[in-house]
Curated annotation (Swiss-Prot):
Organism, scientific name: Saccharolobus solfataricus (strain ATCC 35092 / DSM 1617 / JCM 11322 / P2) (Sulfolobus solfataricus)
InterPro entries attached to this UniProt entry: Ribosomal_protein_uL10 (IPR050323), Ribosomal_uL10 (IPR001790), Ribosomal_uL10-like_insert (IPR040637), Ribosomal_uL10-like_insert_sf (IPR043164), Ribosomal_uL10-like_sf (IPR043141), Ribosomal_uL10_arc (IPR022909)
Miscellaneous comment text of the record: Was called L10e in this organism; in this case 'e' is for E.coli-like, not eukaryotic-type protein.
Segments traversing the membrane: none
Protein name: Large ribosomal subunit protein uL10
GO-annotated cellular components: cytosolic large ribosomal subunit
Gene Ontology process terms (BP): cytoplasmic translation
Classification via CDD domains: Ribosomal_P0_L10e (cd05795)
UniProt superkingdom: Archaea
């Protein structure tokens, strides 16, 4: 009798459910990552678009939570870890890819749908100028309520100029919904919200799946800049650093040579320019007290002092600019990461 009761019980299980569990079990075993997404309020036709987009990269299944639980147990997954996420209508995404990269796709991949009552505009909702294709009639009063200027031409309603019917954050007027649909305007964005990812035994909640790529990039750039500045300061011998270090040392050497009057082919011009500037300055200082017997070229003096001042400014700028440029940072990061 027990065997008969068991056989009758087994017959009550629909064959499609057995096939579904079998397929799910194989998908779980052959996937490195499983993501569970919330299907509540998500349009079915948009899910079809996602399937097409992820073809070859992931398998998307809409199934009952109970069947997934059975399949997960069959595949050796501790279902208790996922129990809290298996409520309401869900979609299951099976992939071999990294869970963070896959979640990033869903974060960035937004789809449009027609507006429904109560929807808020994420951007300006505009009824464009031109032929609406709608026959003149009661619809004119609807356009009037929306303050959209119209005219009737060849029995059709024409919008005179582009008109904003909702600004970002505004509830889209109910009167505008049928018009927007007839014009094929989809002002609302939707995206599939991921609840959790299961990756090789690790449960990763949705809030932990989000990556701040701009923040990471900024941190790496800042770290590279600081490291480069320190390397230049201590003359750390690497090809990228030495290029800046040698230039800095050369300028310091020229500045020192011009200060002490040490003449070399490289420093001669700087030494002579500095000496001439000092001579003019001294002559100017004592010219009022002693007749030097020469006429001081005051214009030349100011001109000769100006390059020296500009040279000092340039040297000061070079001293302040201890870090590499944006192009050099990008080049360095490229070589760092291959």
């Amino acid at each position: 009798m027990k065997r008969l009761a068991l056989a009758l019980k087994q017959r009550k299980v629909a064959s499609w459910k057995l096939e579904e569990v079998k397929e799910l079990t194989e998908l779980i075993k052959n996937s490195n990552t499983i993501l569970i997404g919330n299907l509540e309020g998500f349009p079915a036709d948009k899910l079809h678009e996602i399937r097409k987009k992820l073809r070859g990269k992931a398998t998307i299944k809409v199934t009952k939570n109970t069947l997934f639980k059975i399949a997960a147990k069959n595949a050796g997954i501790d279902i208790e870890k996922l129990e809290q996420y298996l409520t309401g209508p869900n979609v299951f995404i099976f992939t071999k890819d990294n869970p963070f990269i896959t979640n990033m796709f869903f974060e960035n991949y937004k789809l449009r749908r027609y507006a429904m009552p109560g929807d808020k505009a994420e951007e300006e909702v505009v009824i464009p100028a031109g032929d609406t294709g709608m026959p003149a009639g009661p619809i004119l009063s609807v356009f009037g309520k929306l303050k959209v200027q119209t005219k009737v031409q060849d029995g059709k309603v024409h919008v005179v100029k582009d008109t904003v019917v909702a600004k970002p954050g505004d509830v889209i007027p109910a009167e505008a919904l049928p018009i927007l649909q007839k014009l094929g305007i989809m002002p609302v964005y939707v995206k599939l919200k991921i609840k959790v990812a299961y990756h090789e035994g690790l449960v990763i909640p949705a809030e932990s799946l989000k990556l701040d790529l701009e923040g990471y990039r900024s941190n790496i750039t800042e770290a590279y800049r600081n490291a480069f500045t320190l390397a230049v300061e201590i003359a750390y011998p690497t090809p990228d650093v030495l290029k800046f270090t040698i230039s800095k040392v050369f300028k310091n050497a020229i500045a020192l040579a011009s200060e002490i009057g040490y003449i070399t082919p490289e420093s001669a011009q700087a030494v002579i320019s500095k000496a001439v500037a000092k001579a003019y300055a001294l002559a100017t200082a004592i010219g009022g007290k002693v007749d030097l017997g020469v006429q001081l070229p005051t214009v030349q003096q100011s001109q000769s002092q100006q390059p020296a001042a500009e040279e000092k400014k340039e040297e000061k700028k070079e001293e302040e600019k201890k870090g590499p440029s944006e192009e050099e940072i990008a080049s360095g990061l490229a070589s760092l990461f291959g």
